[in-house]
A protein has these predicted regions:
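Conserved ABC ATPase signature
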Residues: 75-79, 83
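ABC-type ATPase nucleotide-binding domains, specifically the catalytic core motifs of the NBD
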Residues: 2-8, 35-51, 61-66, 78, ...
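ABC ATPase NBD coupling module
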Residues: 1-17, 35, 43, 165-170, ...
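Short catalytic/signature loops enriched in Gly
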Residues: 69-72, 160-252
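Conserved ABC ATPase "signature" region
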Residues: 51-70, 122, 179
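A short, proline-enriched helix->beta-strand linker immediately N-terminal to the Walker B motif
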Residues: 94-98
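P-loop NTP-binding/switch modules centered on Walker-like glycine-rich loops
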Residues: 101, 105, 109-189
C-alpha cells in the first residue's frame, strides 16, 4: 500500500471497518465506552459530541442493547462478552462503512449470543448495504451467512466459489475434509479428522501446500504448486487432480 498515512486514516473507519476477534482487546479499559464511541464518530464527521453520542445510542439500540446510556457511561470490564462484541460491532458500523471485515466475530460467544450477533450482522447488511467479509474456521457459519466462500490453507486460497458450489460440491481435498469433520445430529457416523501436521509457514514446500496431509497426493503434488482453475461458472479450485475420474470424495 503506497497511500499516505493521512489518506489511510480517512478511509479506515469511514470506508472500511474492522471487528476484531476479541472485543476486550478492541476497547480501551480505562476510558468510558461513550468517550471512545464519540471520538470515533467526531474524527470522521462534523457532528458535535452531543450529536455523536445520540447517534451512538441509536446504533446500540438497533443492536438490541438495553440501557444504552448506562452502557455509554460504563467501562468495557463492566460488560459481558456478548455486550462488548455488540459494542465493537456498533462502533465499526457507526460511520456506515462500505466494507466490514469481521475476524471470528462469534468465536468468543456462547451459542445464544452467537445467533443474535449473526442475525444482527445480516440485518445491518440488508438495511445499510454494507459488504461483509468474515474470517472464520466455522464452515456452518460461512454456509449460513455467505454468498461466496473462499477456503484457505496455510495462507493460500485452495477453493473459492458460490456458497452452493463450495458446500454442496466441494472439489479440493481440504474443503472436503473440513466439511466431513462437521458433526451432524442426523447421522450416526464417526467423525473424520485430517491426518498429518501443518506445514512450517516459514519453509513452504515447492509443491501443493496440502500434499503432506492429502490421501490422494501423487508425485506432481510434491513438485509443483497447483494454480486455481475453473471447475464451474463461479467455482475455482487449486488441485492437480481436480476433474480426474479416479478422484474420490473423502466425504463418502
Amino acid at each position: 500500500v503506497t497511500m499516505r498515512r493521512a489518506a489511510l486514516s480517512a478511509i479506515r473507519g469511514r470506508e472500511i471497518s474492522l471487528v476484531f476477534q476479541s472485543p476486550g482487546a478492541t476497547l480501551n479499559p480505562v476510558r468510558k465506552i461513550g468517550s471512545q464511541f464519540v471520538e470515533t464518530i467526531c474524527y470522521h464527521t462534523n457532528l458535535t459530541r452531543r450529536e455523536a453520542r445520540e447517534k451512538a445510542a441509536a446504533i446500540l439500540q438497533k443492536l438490541n442493547m438495553r440501557e444504552t446510556e448506562r452502557v455509554l457511561d460504563g467501562y468495557a470490564f463492566e460488560l459481558s462478552g456478548g455486550m462488548k462484541q455488540r459494542v465493537s460491532i456498533a462502533m465499526a458500523l457507526a460511520l456506515e462503512p462500505k466494507l466490514l471485515l469481521a475476524d471470528e466475530p462469534t468465536s468468543a460467544l456462547d451459542a445464544t449470543v452467537q445467533k443474535a450477533v449473526v442475525e444482527e450482522l445480516l440485518a445491518l447488511h440488508r438495511e445499510m448495504g454494507t459488504a461483509i467479509v468474515i474470517v472464520t474456521h466455522n464452515m456452518m457459519l460461512s454456509a449460513y451467512m455467505a454468498d461466496r466462500i473462499a477456503v484457505m490453507y496455510a495462507g493460500e486460497i485452495v477453493e473459492i466459489g458460490a456458497k452452493a458450489e463450495v458446500m454442496d460440491a466441494p472439489q479440493h481435498p481440504y474443503t472436503q475434509a473440513l466439511i466431513a469433520s462437521i458433526p451432524r445430529l442426523d447421522e450416526e457416523k464417526e467423525l473424520k479428522g485430517i491426518d498429518g501436521r501443518r506445514i512450517d509457514l516459514a519453509v513452504l514446500p515447492p509443491g501443493c501446500i496440502f500434499a503432506n496431509r492429502c490421501d490422494r497426493a501423487v508425485a506432481i503434488c510434491s513438485m509443483r504448486a497447483p494454480r486455481l482453475q475453473a471447475v464451474g461458472a463461479d467455482h475455482h479450485v487449486a488441485c492437480h487432480l481436480c476433474g480426474k475420474e479416479d478422484v474420490r470424495d473423502v466425504r463418502q
